[in-house]
Every structure is written in structure tokens, then in C-alpha cells.
Amino acid sequence: MRHCINCCVQLFPEDTHKQQVACQGGPHHSHQACPTCKGENKILFRVDSKQMNLLAVLEVRTEGNENWGGFLRFRKGKRCSLVFGLIIMTLVMASYILSGAHQELLISSPFHYGGFPSNPSVMDGENPSDVKEHHYQPSVNNISYVKDYPSIKLIIDSIAARIEFTTRQLPDLQDLKRQELHMFSVIPSKFLPTSKSPCWYEEFSGRNTTDPYLTNSYVLYSKRFRSTFDALRKVFWGHLSHVQGKHFRLRCLPHFYIIGQPKCGTTDLYDRLRLHPEVKFSAIKEPHWWTRKRFGIVRLRDGLRDRYPVEDYLDLFDLAAHQIHQGLQAASAEQPSKMNKIIIGEASASTMWDNNAWTFFYDNSTDGEPPFLTQDFIHAFQPEAKLIVMLRDPVERLYSDYLYFASSNKSADDFHEKVTEALQLFENCMLDYSLRACVYNNTLNNAMPVRLQVGLYAVYLLDWLTVFSKEQFLILRLEDHASNVKYTMHKVFQFLNLGPLSEKQEALMTKSPASNTRRPEDRSLGPMWPITQKILREFYGPFNTRLAQVLDDEAFAWKTT
């Protein structure tokens, strides 16, 4: 029979500093409670990320035994303390060395690889009213992060030394057709001359009892869109053209696209612009069809599903097509050549930058760069499309993006650590591949704990300018939009050749409250650390400088925001 020596050690991940557990040891032959301590609760202390005395967590309890002398009891208790102390120290050091993770054991390097979340699958805009609050910064830094700055600066310098804005190789039309045979068979090469939006009539072979949206993937995979399509079903047959026993439906693509960027005010721009009577948007604000749904990506974390056919995308514009059809029918009787003024828009904030699906569907090129980009296909069908881009200081965009999409443990400290992790991952890619290859690298983008790549505006814009002219773009800054909404909206109206609004309509559009406001719990977290801001400004600096050169506007360098 052995005596109970209670040497209890336990690590707790929570923030409590002690916890009680029942002792189950003691001088017994079976699993009954220890007669010495009588199952009493023992106090266990937490070992956290601060400096710690490992032996302080050991509690040795020995009580008298008639067969042992005092000296023997003292030696055995001391020996147990020493053995358990060495065991705990070994386990802690092994955990630190093997994982390098910051798991409240020891303060680890900020450059570690952990479990990285996948990128979110839903993009959204940023509220202009949140812009000004980002300029305030706390007066002090986390001291440990300041000490880490020299090593982080080496990473940033390494990235900057490898930045080259090279010209991409453009695919020819036949290559595009081979990749999307069905899409090219559905969308014609010419559109109706009397519609500002690219529209055409196609034959509908169903009957008046046929459900045209029965197999639409947007309906099947999202309950919130079903009411919209229920309304479209009820009026569908009445909006067909009936000629010599045949039925024709009007199909349309967008006249303009709001292509980006996420957390840059696209939602607010969309909400104001749709108040104009000549503008009609898709049934869903962000279909993400060009970048995701046509590849079968519903949520990135769920992998690939069945691809959404182009017909499902075109269904989203049926409500606008119905109104255009009515206008065309009315005009044909009076003035056949009269142009229909209604224009269709689409506002997926992923269109400009997200090409993550290419590795799953296109043959890999020898240099790691995607052979096809989203804009190649849009240009193939709509070479005259108009493109609107809303941008903001990429440093503040990244923090807003982090606050919006992070689900738990959000803080300035957590953001700083994720930024440093992302920078190291990006540098590792740049050591072996080109800038473009890294920006469009799906594995890297899913590994980075913050979406560092979304703020590399110059890379994306230069690639879009390989197929579209600069005159087809309207590029806005969220900072300007937040300070003067009326001026921004007038620029948009002029760019889209929209008619003037009445005073009442304009007041409603410009004085409406900002959309997509920041959540109160995110506001309470405050701004990022000044040292984090400094790191990000140095990283994004070369890209902002190039963007300002391309646009011939120093405001896009964000040197004084």
C-alpha cells in the first residue's frame, strides 16, 4: 500500500487564476476516495503567458504515517516535488518548441503558423460614417510589438525589393471560348440597338404553367431569395413576347458593374444609386457569379458544388428586363428607334480582385500566374461595359475587413499578430514567384489570416486595364464620398449618362443615412496599434504610389489621410 502524495499541476486556458478539483489519490487498494485528504478540493493555479514559477504550481501534501519518520516523509515529499517540477518544465518547453503557438503558455514569436481560417465568402461595403473614426490612434503601443518591428521591417523590405508590375499575357478569344463553351452559346455577340443595357430576345419553349426558376441555383441554395423569385413567377408569362405561336423572353446583362473593393463603401454607393429611377440592379446585390458561382463556389469553406449556369445569373436581371421590355414595346408603336433609358447594374465587390477559383479549372501556367482572369470573359461579351470602383486607404480597409469578418477574440493585439503572420506568408511566396502569381495564389490567400491581398489595388487595376480602357472606369475614394456624398453621386450620374433628379429625389439620395454601419461591439474595440498602422503603411506604400501614378492623382497614395 502506497501513501498519497498529491502533486497536482494543471494548465487552464481560461482567464481565471485558480480552479478547484477533487483529489482521488491516497493509501488505498481500490479507487475509493483518499482517506488522508478525504477527497477534499485542492487549489490549482493557472500557468499563463507571463513569467512564471513552475514550482509554485506544485502542491505537495503529505501527512503522518506511523511507520514513517519525519525525515523520511520530508525526503519523499521533496523528491516528488522535484520530479513533478521537472516533468512540467519539460512539457511546457516541449510545447513551446514544437508548436511555437501563442497558447497562453509562453510569449512566442509573432511569426508562427497556426490554424488559418478560410476567406469569407460574402463581400460587403463599408459605411462612410466609419471612415473618420479610424484616424484616431492610441498614444501608446504594445511594447513587445515595437521591439519586433526591426524583424518585421526586414520582411517588408524583402517584399518591396521584389515588386515588379509586369504586363500579363492576354488569352485570345478562341481560348476563352474553349473554357466556357456553354456561356458563349447562350450570350449573343450583338445586342438590341434600342437598349442602353446589353439585352436580346431568346425563345422560351415552356408553357404558361412552366416554372422558369425551378432549377435556379440561387433559389435552391438560398432561402432568402425565394420570395423574390416567387414574385417573378407570378408575372413571368405576362412579360413574354408572343409572335406566331412562339414565346420570347428578354434577356439582359448589366450595363455597368460596381466591381470593388470590399469594405470600401460599395454598399452605400449601391443603396444610393438604386434610388435613381433609371437604374435597376440585379435581384441580389452581390451575385458573385463571375468570380465564384459559375465555378460552383457557394462558400469557400464548403468547397466546390455544381456550377451555376449562366442562365441562373441572367434570371437575376428579369425584373429589370421586364421593365425594359415594356418600354421597348411602348416605344415600338410610336418611335421604334427611341433608346430605352433604363440601365442595369451589378455590385459584386469581389469582381475586381477574386480569381481564386482559377487553379481548380484552368491548366496551371509555368510561372504560377492565372491564364484567364474574370475581366477577360466580361470583356469578351461586353467590351463597352462601364466599371465603377470605390477604394479607400488600404490600411484602414484591412482593419475594417478584420473587424467585420473575424468572429471571436477580436482585438488590436490579435489584429497585429495576424498582420505579421500574413506578411511573412506573403514574403515566402514572393521569394519564389512573381507578384501577380502571389496575389492570385489561392493557397496563399486562404492561408493568410487577414486579407492583405485585397488592398493591392494597383495590381488588380493594371490587369483590368489590359482589356478595358481607362475611360471605362470611374474610380472613387471612400474618403471623398464620406465628406461630400452629393459631389460623388453627381460624378456617378455623369459617368453613367443618367438624367437629372428632382430636388426631392436628390435630397432623398444624398441625405439618406449611411448604409452598413459598423457594429457597436466592433466600435468599442478601438483602432489598431500605431505600430501596426506603421507596418501596413510601409507595406502598402509602393502599391499606393503606383496606383497614384496610373490614375495621375496623388490622393490615391493616401500619404495624408
From Swiss-Prot:
Molecular function GO terms recorded: 3'-phosphoadenosine 5'-phosphosulfate binding; N-acetylgalactosamine 4-sulfate 6-O-sulfotransferase activity
Modifications the protein undergoes after translation, according to the UniProt entry: Glycosylated.
Entry keyword annotation includes Transferase: yes
Binding locations of 3'-phosphoadenylyl sulfate: 263-267, 392, 400
Protein topology in the membrane: Single-pass type II membrane protein
Cytoplasmic-side positions: 1-80
Subcellular location(s) per record: Golgi apparatus membrane
Example GO biological process: hexose biosynthetic process
One Pfam family in the UniProt entry: Sulfotransfer_1
Transmembrane regions: 81-101
Documented activity regulation: Inhibited by phenyl beta-GalNAc(4,6-SO(4)).
Gene3D superfamilies: P-loop containing nucleotide triphosphate hydrolases
Class in the EC hierarchy, top level: transferase
Cofactor entry: a divalent metal cation; glutathione
One Gene Ontology term, aspect cellular component: Golgi membrane
Glycosylated residues (UniProt): 364
Residues in the Lumenal compartment per record: 102-561
Keyword field: Disulfide bond, Glycoprotein, Golgi apparatus, Membrane, Signal-anchor, Transferase, Transmembrane, Transmembrane helix
Cited function: It also transfers sulfate to a unique non-reducing terminal sequence, GalNAc(4SO4)-GlcA(2SO4)-GalNAc(6SO4), to yield a highly sulfated structure similar to the structure found in thrombomodulin chondroitin sulfate.
Similarity remark: Belongs to the sulfotransferase 1 family.
PANTHER family referenced in this protein's UniProt entry, alphabetically: CARBOHYDRATE SULFOTRANSFERASE 15
Subunit: Homodimer; disulfide-linked (Potential). The relevance of homodimerization is however unsure. May interact with phosphorylated proteins in resting B-cells, including HCK.
Protein's recorded name: Carbohydrate sulfotransferase 15
Species, as recorded: Mus musculus (Mouse)
